Every structure is written in structure tokens, then in C-alpha cells.
């Protein structure tokens, strides 16, 4: 009980900054303050925090049924595995205020698939509660104002507009409020959002906008702050590698070029231990040789294949890199020059190929999963086996 009182006192202190969403809730004063803060987190796409606060509101007032409504809103409406419908079915609608019941009715429509009457219900509750921040926000996607719907909401409900300003920031970044992206205005909108609500999502948004602008250092710095908000299993963790790799792209490309050279040297020298540094057990290296025979999986057994080639030289050059948008995969294209002789002959054969390789980022570093070689220019590939 002591811990509960401390918890309640902590959340109650949030009332100084919480944005009031519901005017006629049946929750008691303390739960009402916590609930409003929970809705602010939900509006700002911080569902995990919102659910935690909703549970806290329910702990302080068992009759605060709107807390269960928020938990249902945060759940998925997927018909196969989502739990929103089950959670809604368990709600005692007799304990909901009229505004809360309107929210409930709209959520029920989201569980009906193609048979829903969401638009009809939306029109009805908007007419009934034109001055409710909650009702106007949860129905905002039905507006025909496009991106201006967020500005309209911010003007009408300035105290509840943290999430709206976050969306306005994207509108400026996408160029929806003019002829071109306006990053300065986008950052100002994020600043307004953060002034009202200091949650992590606005930091994540600032990072995304910085990345759109090409400022990956700024993106990385803000993403780290978003993760720091609650670091374990943070939903913002996944973007950190993307921003970090962009910041360090030149070094990364240099290291990948060297890795490609090293793995090829390991193959030519039949150094299995060195080769294993550059491949992963989770995905086999699939290779296509310059003799244009079938693709095959390059495994440890490949080192035992007989070869009648004796290399005089083998050099890789002119690397180019094509990264996936999230920087977790890269295609290397390059050229190889050299010469070799075949057993029983002193004739030197000019070798010239163009090649590509695919590398993926793993928990154990970058690993190669595919290579392809083909004759290029006036030279030859390796002979057929």
C-alpha cells in the first residue's frame, strides 16, 4: 500500500502539465489526472507508457472504467490475433461517461472489419461533442482537410495539441504546407510539441526529420535521447544502427571493401578459419562463379574441391556500394583483374571479371551471403569444372 500511495503521488504531480482530454469522466480526481496523461501518451504514439498509466489509474480507482477503454484502444484490432475486441467486450459501459461511451462506440467499429460503420459513428459523435479534444482527436483521420486537419486541431485545442504539432512537423518536412520541405518550420513544430509533452516520440520524430534532411548526426543524437527515455526493449532502438551507420558511412565502406578482399584471399589461400569470420551460420553464402556454371552454396566442403588453377595475381578494384534504406544490407559491385596458369601449362591466362556481393549486418558484424562473378572486357573467368 505504501508503494501504491507513492506511485499515486508521483502520477498526481503530473497534473501540473497533463493535457485535459475528457471533461465528464467518472474517474476520481487522482485517476482522472493519470488518465489524461495516459491519453496524451497514447495520442503521441507512446502506447506502452499509456497502458502502464492506464493500469495505474485503475489501481487508484477501480471504477475508472475509461482506463480499460484506453488499454483496449492500445491493443490491435486484427481479427486473427488482436485483443481489442475481447477487451472491449469486458468493459462495463455503465461506468463510462457520455464522452467515454462515444470513444467506446468508435472503437467497437474498428473491430468489425469491412462491415463497420465507423464514418457514420464518427459524424454522430462529432456533432454531439464538437468541443471535446478527445473526440476531435480520435476522429481526426476522417477529416477531409488533409494535412491542415492537424493545424485546425492545434488552433481549436492548443492545450491538447502536442501530438498535432508532431504531425504538423511531418507536414512541413514532407512539403505538404508549401511547395517544398521546410525543415526549419518542422523543427519549430517539434519544439512546440515538446513544450507541452516531453515524451520520447517527438524525439524520434525529430530524428526522422533530421534524417530526411540528411543530418544523420542530429538524427543519431536525438534517437539516443528517445531510447534513453526507457532503454530496455525500447521501440526506438531499431533506428539507432541506421543513423549510426550513416554517420560512419565512409569508415563502413572502407571496412567492407577490406572485408571483401580478405574473404577472397581466405578462399584463394584455403584458409577456412579466416573465411569463417566473414560468413554466418544463419544464412549460407550462395555463389556464382565466373565460369557461369550453376549457383551453389559455398561451405567448408568447398575448400576441398580440386582445382587446376594456379594464380599469378588476383586484385579487386573500383568498389561501389548500394545500401538498403535501413543500412542493414549492402550490395558491393567491383572488378577483379589478374592472371593464372593451369596445371600442365605455362601459358598465362588473363583474368578479368565484374562482380557483386551482398553483405548483411548481424549481431556479430557484417557477413557476406552472396557473390556473383562474370567475365568482363577482354579477359576470361575461371575455367569450367
For each feature predicted by the language model, list its residue ranges.
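Alpha-helical segment of the N-proximal tetratricopeptide repeat
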Residues: 27-56, 60, 101-114, 138
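Residue-level recognition of tetratricopeptide repeat
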Residues: 30, 63-66, 98, 130-135, ...
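Structural motif corresponding to the intra-repeat A-B loop/turn of tetratricopeptide repeats
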Residues: 44, 78, 112-113, 175-180, ...
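Alpha-helical repeat scaffolds
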Residues: 54, 82-94, 115-126, 146-158, ...
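Short, low-complexity N-terminal intrinsically disordered segments enriched in polar/charged residues
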Residues: 244-281, 382-385
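A solvent-exposed, acidic/Ser-Thr-rich amphipathic alpha-helical stretch
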Residues: 272-326, 335, 349-351
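Short beta-strand edge/turn micro-motifs at domain boundaries
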Residues: 352-382
Amino acid at each position: 500500500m505504501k508503494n501504491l500511495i507513492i506511485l499515486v503521488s508521483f502520477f498526481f504531480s503530473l497534473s501540473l502539465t497533463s493535457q485535459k482530454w475528457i471533461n465528464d469522466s467518472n474517474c476520481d480526481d487522482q485517476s482522472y489526472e493519470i488518465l489524461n496523461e495516459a491519453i496524451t501518451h497514447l495520442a503521441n504514439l507512446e502506447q506502452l507508457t499509456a497502458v502502464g498509466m492506464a493500469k495505474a489509474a485503475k489501481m487508484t480507482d477501480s471504477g475508472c472504467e475509461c482506463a480499460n477503454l484506453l488499454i483496449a484502444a492500445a491493443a490491435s484490432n486484427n481479427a486473427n490475433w488482436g485483443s481489442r475486441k475481447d477487451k472491449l467486450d469486458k468493459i462495463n459501459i455503465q461506468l463510462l461517461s457520455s464522452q467515454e461511451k462515444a470513444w467506446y462506440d468508435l472503437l467497437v467499429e474498428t473491430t468489425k472489419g469491412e462491415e463497420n460503420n465507423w464514418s457514420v459513428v464518427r459524424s454522430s459523435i462529432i456533432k454531439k461533442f464538437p468541443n471535446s479534444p478527445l473526440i476531435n482527436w480520435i476522429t481526426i483521420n476522417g477529416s477531409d482537410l488533409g494535412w491542415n486537419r492537424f493545424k485546425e486541431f492545434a488552433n481549436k485545442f492548443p492545450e491538447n495539441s502536442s501530438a498535432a504539432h508532431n504531425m504538423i512537423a511531418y507536414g512541413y518536412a514532407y512539403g505538404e504546407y508549401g511547395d517544398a520541405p521546410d525543415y526549419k518550420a518542422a523543427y519549430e513544430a517539434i519544439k512546440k510539441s515538446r513544450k507541452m509533452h516531453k515524451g520520447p516520440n517527438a524525439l524520434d520524430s525529430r530524428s526522422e526529420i533530421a534524417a530526411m534532411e540528411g543530418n544523420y548526426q542530429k538524427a543519431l543524437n536525438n534517437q539516443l535521447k528517445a531510447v534513453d527515455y526507457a532503454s530496455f526493449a525500447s521501440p526506438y532502438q531499431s533506428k539507432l544502427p541506421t543513423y549510426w551507420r550513416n554517420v560512419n558511412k565512409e569508415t563502413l565502406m572502407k571496412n567492407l571493401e577490406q572485408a571483401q578482399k580478405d574473404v577472397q584471399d581466405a578462399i584463394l589461400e584455403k584458409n577456412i578459419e579466416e573465411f569463417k569470420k566473414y560468413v554466418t551460420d544463419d544464412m549460407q553464402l550462395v555463389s556464382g562463379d565466373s565460369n557461369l556454371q550453376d549457383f551453389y552454396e559455398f561451405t567448408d566442403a568447398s575448400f576441398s574441391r580440386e582445382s587446376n588453377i594456379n594464380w599469378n595475381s588476383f586484385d579487386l578494384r573500383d568498389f561501389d556500394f548500394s545500401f538498403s534504406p535501413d543500412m542493414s544490407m549492402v550490395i558491393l559491385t567491383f572488378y577483379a583483374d589478374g592472371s593464372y596458369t593451369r596445371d600442365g601449362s605455362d601459358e598465362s591466362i588473363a583474368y578479368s571479371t565484374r562482380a557483386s556481393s551482398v553483405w548483411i549486418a548481424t549481431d556479430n558484424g557484417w557477413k557476406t551471403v552472396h557473390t556473383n562473378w562474370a567475365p568482363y572486357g577482354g579477359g576470361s573467368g575461371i575455367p569450367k569444372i
